[in-house]
Amino acid sequence: LTTSADANTTAFDVLAIGRSGVDIYPLQTGVGLELVESFGKFLGGSAANVAVAAARLGCTSALISGVGDDPFGRYVSGELVRLGVDNRFIVVDETYATPVTFCEIFPPDDFPLYFYRKPSAPDLQVRPENIDSAAVRSARLYWSTVTGLSEEP
């Protein structure tokens, strides 16, 4: 990792901001959620997925997002590290739970999603003071979701 002019800031190849959460996928396909007997738990959220993809391609990556102060939030934070993403910009929110998304799998191309993010989500509570502006300025690529612009903290 290289550092920017600010000695405390790492210059990332990719710095993503936006959704992170837990995706719950059925381990059976072709049946509705009401008939599924077992599920798998996976890191989810578009921004988290982008950061992980960049890390898998050998880039240094970090994520700016929020998680709840709950077991799923700890899972998200730990999975990011395990998958090679710097998690120092993950904000833990004590008010809102970490979002969970369920998916049904009907091959070849029907994958209904059910988002549990209401009344709000921790990634929508990230405030300007939670964002390291030097990290944003020094990143080779800054990637943002549009969802993050849909609600003010």
What are these regions (language model features)?
Residues 1-16, 81, 107-153:
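Ribokinase/PfkB-type carbohydrate-kinase core domain
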Residues 2-86, 125-128:
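Glycine-rich phosphate/adenosyl-contacting loop at the front of the ribokinase-like
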Residues 10, 57, 95-99, 109:
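Short, basic and Ser/Thr-rich N-terminal targeting/leader segments
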Residues 25, 75, 96, 114-116, ...:
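Sequence-level detector for tyrosine residue identity
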Residues 66-72, 94-96, 119-120:
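Acidic, glycine-rich active-site loops and adjacent beta-strand->loop/helix elements
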Residues 72, 76, 86, 96-98, ...:
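Generic hydrophobic, aliphatic-rich segments that mediate packing or membrane embedding
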Residues 77-96, 106:
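A glycine-rich helix N-cap at a beta->alpha junction
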Residues 100-104:
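Short beta-strand scaffold segments in enzyme catalytic cores
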